[in-house]
Design a protein with these regions (language model features):
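Interaction-mediating elements
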Residues: 1-127
Length: 127
């Protein structure tokens, strides 16, 4: 179960926010093979003055459309799967929204299953 936080400029329309959310989820389904209903995200609209970033980092230019995608998931994905996920998310967003691939920053954090509760105060993934 990935849990996704998406931080983006507050000025984005609801349509763009929803599209980005769906594109991230589609990418997770495609690469990580998660079920369709495994869809847990929070979208955080952020005022421009609160989005801090350099104009250029690692030879990648950034604009005011910069978004941060934070994915927290269970362990077990290979480096190749993670790289494929990053590429697919950036490509899908660049093709379908005003956000360029340069402006898609992704951070993925793996955490053990003992750190997850899907309700009822139970760590359901612990056998």
């Amino acid at each position: 179960m990935p849990f996704v936080n998406i931080y983006l400029p507050a000025g984005f329309t609801q349509q763009v926010k929803t599209r980005i959310s769906l594109l991230v989820h589609e990418s997770l389904m495609s690469v990580f093979k998660i079920p369709e209903k495994d869809y847990f995200q929070v979208i955080h609209p952020v005022m421009a003055e609160h989005l801090i970033y350099p104009d250029n980092y690692l030879n990648v230019p950034h604009t005011a459309n910069l978004i941060y995608i934070q994915v927290t998931c269970g362990p077990g994905r290979t480096i190749e799967m993670k790289q494929a996920l990053y590429a697919l998310i950036a490509e899908k967003i660049a093709v379908s929204t005003p956000v360029s691939a340069n402006d898609v920053i992704i951070v993925l954090t793996e955490t053990g299953w003992e750190n997850w509760s899907f309700g009822q105060g139970i760590a359901q993934m612990i056998k």
